[in-house]
């Protein structure tokens, strides 16, 4: 396996403070607000959801090119990330939804499944931590 990118993130403040990467990214952190109200700082779950969504979206673009799928509007990827607690341990769970403007469920199903196989974040989240794939509002 050939290394194509590497980054290092550092923090010493847990969820209350900031995190930075050695290549220049920096953001303030806070605990997630349970009431889903807007917060000025980010939390790790938001960062994970954002990274997963952008990675999965890129996989969708690649699969569309490989299989010559086309839609009149770009498909939209939504990633849901949940933080759970059980027996004193925290667990991250995540799921992916793809929204297309196509009525062809078979093409959409092939697209989301191939993108799921390709996306490195999807390969990280497996088994009981994966909430599943959803296509145009229908859970697969």
From Swiss-Prot:
Disulfide linkage: none
Task: Provide the GO biological process annotations.
Answer: response to oxidative stress
Taken from the record, one Pfam family name reads OsmC
Q: Which domain of life is it from?
A: Bacteria
InterPro entries assigned to the protein according to its UniProt record, in alphabetical order = KH_dom-like_a/b (IPR015946), OHR (IPR019953), OsmC/Ohr_fam (IPR003718), OsmC/Ohrsf (IPR036102)
Which family does the record claim for this protein?
Belongs to the OsmC/Ohr family.
Q: What is this protein called?
A: Organic hydroperoxide resistance protein-like
């Amino acid at each position: 396996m050939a290394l194509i990118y590497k980054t290092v993130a550092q923090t010493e403040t847990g969820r209350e403070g900031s995190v930075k990467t050695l290549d220049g990214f920096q953001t303030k952190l806070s605990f997630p607000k349970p009431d889903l109200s807007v917060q000025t700082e980010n939390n790790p779950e938001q960062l994970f959801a954002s990274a997963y969504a952008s990675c999965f979206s890129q996989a969708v673009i690649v699969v569309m090119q490989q299989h010559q799928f086309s839609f009149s509007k770009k498909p939209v990827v939504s990633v849901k990330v949940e933080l759970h607690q059980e027996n004193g341990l925290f667990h991250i769970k995540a799921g992916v939804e793809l929204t297309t403007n196509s009525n062809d469920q078979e093409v959409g199903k092939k697209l989301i499944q191939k993108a799921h196989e390709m996306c490195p974040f999807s390969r990280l989240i497996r088994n009981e931590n994966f909430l599943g794939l959803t296509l145009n509002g229908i859970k697969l």
